[in-house]
């Protein structure tokens, strides 16, 4: 049968098809006629975007139906990748690109093999199979590139009992990874571990190199007593997030936990409890926030004051 494909320029293309043709097949026919690669084509019928694996009959597209062709702009959007040397790389990507795709683009530009790349966004290490949109990475977002050094190093972890544990690590290991290694050696669950270096508590998603932890550095391990507590954070959309916290956690800590779960930068968060806005340096116990209390999260619009 014949169908028509109308482009945004108003041009109409006529195609010979069968009901059993898939959307991929149709895109190939359009490529043959117009030279537009399938991955730049979006086909719309009855207000719906058509999926590649489905057939014309799945969408009840009959003879002399008209599809609309929208071009998927090459690159979709720009993002930035900042290396530890301070160099910033600009990449053309789409929200649907996977982290693997992004690593391949970095390899094309910089020659760094994907297996030596770790990408960090909002404090989280990004997993290869996930997409940019999974992590809410939008245009002009900045990712951080950490190199996974071949050949690792030793660091020491000192417990409050005075015992010292030796670990084999890499600069690109995240704090989560280090806690897992401690669990393997000592049997202490990661959620009961707090690691301190140079007086700072280390955050799970960050890497050793982020904290300038080098070979033979000593970290201090403090046990987080069981019996933290759960609190709830309610957003303006009505979504409720559950957090594991301790009374001694500061409001900054709580905002970091929200960032880990939701990807919202702390400087865009305002937390309200009992009608009061909570200040970063204060603790939950300062505000008498107890187990199963509900905080309200209001977003601070960029550019406000």
From Swiss-Prot:
The keyword Repeat applies. There is a cross-link at residues 6, 11, 27, 29, 33, 48, 63 (Glycyl lysine isopeptide (Lys-Gly) (interchain with G-Cter in ubiquitin)). Residues 1-76, 77-152, 153-228, 229-304 form the Ubiquitin-like domain. Residues 305 form a propeptide. PROSITE patterns: UBIQUITIN_1 (PS00299), UBIQUITIN_2 (PS50053). GO terms for cellular component: cytoplasm; nucleus. It is found in: Cytoplasm; Nucleus. Pfam families: ubiquitin (PF00240). CDD domains: Ubl_ubiquitin (cd01803). Disulfide bonds: none annotated. Keywords: Cytoplasm, Isopeptide bond, Nucleus, Repeat, Ubl conjugation. InterPro entries: Ubiquitin-like_dom (IPR000626), Ubiquitin-like_domsf (IPR029071), Ubiquitin_CS (IPR019954), Ubiquitin_dom (IPR019956), Ubiquitin_ubiquitin-like (IPR050158). Gene3D superfamilies: Phosphatidylinositol 3-kinase Catalytic Subunit, Chain A, domain 1. There is a cross-link at residue 76 (Glycyl lysine isopeptide (Gly-Lys) (interchain with K-? in acceptor proteins)). Its main location: cytoplasm. It comes from the Eukaryota. Ubiquitin exists either covalently attached to another protein, or free (unanchored). When covalently bound, it is conjugated to target proteins via an isopeptide bond either as a monomer (monoubiquitin), a polymer linked via different Lys residues of the ubiquitin (polyubiquitin chains) or a linear polymer linked via the initiator Met of the ubiquitin (linear polyubiquitin chains). Ubiquitin is encoded by several different genes. UBI1 is a polyprotein containing 3 exact head to tail repeats of ubiquitin, UBI4 is a polyprotein containing 4 exact head to tail repeats of ubiquitin. For the sake of clarity sequence features are annotated only for the first chain, and are not repeated for each of the following chains. Belongs to the ubiquitin family. This is Polyubiquitin. It comes from Candida albicans (Yeast). The gene is UBI4.
